[in-house]
Amino acid sequence: MSRTIMLIPISAGVGLTSVSMGLLRAMERKGVSVSFYKPIAQPRTGDDQPDLTSTVMSRNSDIKIGQPMSMSAAETLIGSEKMDVLLETVVERYNQINKDAEVTLIEGLVPTRKHPFANQVNAEIANTLGAEIVFVATPGTDNPTQLKERIEVACSNFGGTKNKSISGVIINKLNAPVDEAGRTRPDLSEIFDDADHAKQANLEVMQIFNTSPIRVLGCVPWSIDLIATRAIDMAKHLKAEIINQGDINTRRIKSITFCARSIPNMIEHFKPGSLLVTSADRPDVIVAAALAAMNGVEIGAVLLTGGYDIPRELVSLCKPAFDTGLPIFKAQGNTWQTSLNLQSFSLEVPADDKERIEFISEHVASHIDGPWVDSLTEGAQASRRLSPPAFRYQLTELARSANKRIVLPEGDEPRTVKAAAICAERGIAQCVLLGNPEEIKRVAAQQGVELGSGIEIIDPKVAQEKYVARLVELRKSKGMTEVVAREQLEDTVVLGTMMLERNEVDGLVSGAVHTTANTIRPPLQIIKTAPNASLVSSIFFMLLPDQVLVYGDCAINPDPNAEQLAEIAIQSADSAAAFGIEPRVAMISYSTGTSGQGADVDKVREATRIAKEKRPDLVIDGPLQYDAAIMENVAASKAPNSPVAGKATVFVFPDLNTGNTTYKAVQRSADLVSIGPMLQGMRKPVNDLSRGALVDDIVYTIALTAIQAGQEQK
């Protein structure tokens, strides 16, 4: 039997959309099938505009989403005393999306001056749908007693705290900066220069838990990253003319500085994520911003006012700085008018800002009560699919429990530094950065990254000498001498590999700068393959909208023979099982079953036979065409008796050309996230990165490596 949860805000400005996204993510992490419904649209501007939460959900997830009624239609029915008609429409649309869901999440109306009927309508909808009520509140400047009283007042509108339908409350924006009236304002006043001096309640989580009249289901701390908008969104709001595009689509604004002072008094504000607002006739500010950019500081953007043009000579002088990605745009009007326009900028997350939506979802989900989320599926059949959010959550949890040390030879590479900081902050792994300590700290400062506990920095020049003798011993049969060993140890991948060989670290991740060959060659020479492995292969985890698939081998073996292909299939199946994916292995070919002949398909057929013989416990079939392996309707006609066709989770390709082409085609055409390649068959875990890897790619590769290290010791 499915359950219905209704989120009801006790006031305006509680961050309802963020809580909805986070609660959905928390349930998806557990593999719960969810649907979402906002009965009445409530856009910030214009009563007949699309609803924000529904739009965000529809563009960024594959869950079923109910069609909201427009606010004007709802107001007409309420004004005509036709609440019964409104509720019948709500029930009709609710029934369209809750049939196959274990949990349906309902988002209630926010009580505002324009919508004073919100509490009444919320109560009627909750009662009609038999929903369990979860209030959403924000403390503002309340002390625990005042917050308790506000929650009690909210409960009184729904039958009081003894109402068994009230499940609890989620506290959002804990310890956020607030204005003089105690409101957490949804505009840029939160990130102006004086934000550091704004009032903060500084409530302790335990105080809230101890005083709340109902169960606290989550306490979500405020973070500046939750409202860090893209530079392009700011430019669009101001209808600004773009002078230099740069990284305008990806740079984030975390603070705003009006450059009215002299340069020496503003240097501290030239920092990552800052929007520098200056009159276009202040060349000193523009040049100072250019110097900061040339030094690696990722300033959010420069906003010019006053209607002046930048002199051509100045543009030419600053061009190298502009080429670093520094966005520059010009607003009409003077600085005062621009300031007023900025105040009206909405910090609601745009539906196309996938990066921020992902951060908000993960941040909120991480602060929702886990046992309560687990309880939502009691009495309902658990979903067997492993969704991408569930898989990513499982990765981080398994990595945390493994608690491993991972060496990163490219320790001064900016993406690697960021990833290491994230891993340390989340407890994913203890990262060891190889590189000049001063250079690493400089790169971290430029990126606005703090290198706290959980990160160790090792200077290669200091550490190299102690590995010389051991490297000579290991490679003596290949003619290794002390002179050559010292030369090779100048390569940080070789140094990291020696640390791994000496059990000083548990795994190695490289490749953001190094080629695949340069990353893999030293471990193959020094670490070698696992005792039960005849080769090293790789897999990618492909995060489809509703499940995670494994593709192998798409990175290492150009043209494996039948024996090698069988080994790749077995390795890939074991890796899938280790990461919570039930392995159903499809051996891919251009032909299904016995319909085709030729050397290529015969190789796949023989590999399938060998794999079955070696591992009769595996569910494996082949040769299968890709469509027969993944689509049930095709499988029904092409391979009706196959235990794998139509429901394969592990896809083993006949050669590197086929595998790599398929992986990239699926990833790019479907705009999917993939994690990998993860190497299999090494005696100790070593993983290679793509040189185009994003920070998140590196984080999850570190997590994979930590998990592999934990499994090696079992």
Swiss-Prot record:
UniProt cross-references to Gene3D superfamilies, sorted A to Z: 3.40.50.10950, HprK N-terminal domain-like (3.40.1390.20), Isocitrate/Isopropylmalate dehydrogenase-like (3.40.50.10750), P-loop containing nucleotide triphosphate hydrolases (3.40.50.300)
Catalytic activity: acetyl-CoA + phosphate = acetyl phosphate + CoA
GO biological process: acetyl-CoA biosynthetic process
UniProt-annotated stretches for the region Phosphate acetyltransferase: 390-714
E.C. numbers: 2.3.1.8
GO molecular function: phosphate acetyltransferase activity
Keywords: Acyltransferase, Cytoplasm, Transferase
Location(s), subcellular: Cytoplasm
GO CC, alphabetical: cytoplasm
Enzymatic class: transferase
InterPro entries in the cross-refs: DRTGG, P-Actrans_bac, P-loop_NTPase, P_AcTrfase, P_AcTrfase_dom1, P_AcTrfase_dom2, Phos_Acetyltrans/Butyryltrans, PTA_PTB
Coiled coil regions, renumbered to chain: none
Main location: cytoplasm
CDD domains: DTBS
Keyword Acyltransferase: yes
Domain of life: Bacteria
Pathway terms, separated by semicolons: Metabolic intermediate biosynthesis; acetyl-CoA biosynthesis; acetyl-CoA from acetate: step 2/2
Family recorded in the similarity comment: In the N-terminal section; belongs to the CobB/CobQ family. In the C-terminal section; belongs to the phosphate acetyltransferase and butyryltransferase family.
Function: Involved in acetate metabolism.
Subunit architecture: Homohexamer.
PANTHER family in UniProt: PHOSPHATE ACETYLTRANSFERASE (PTHR43356:SF3)
Comment field on protein domains: The N-terminal region seems to be important for proper quaternary structure. The C-terminal region contains the substrate-binding site.
Name of the protein in question: Phosphate acetyltransferase
Native source species: Vibrio cholerae serotype O1 (strain ATCC 39315 / El Tor Inaba N16961)
Originating gene: pta
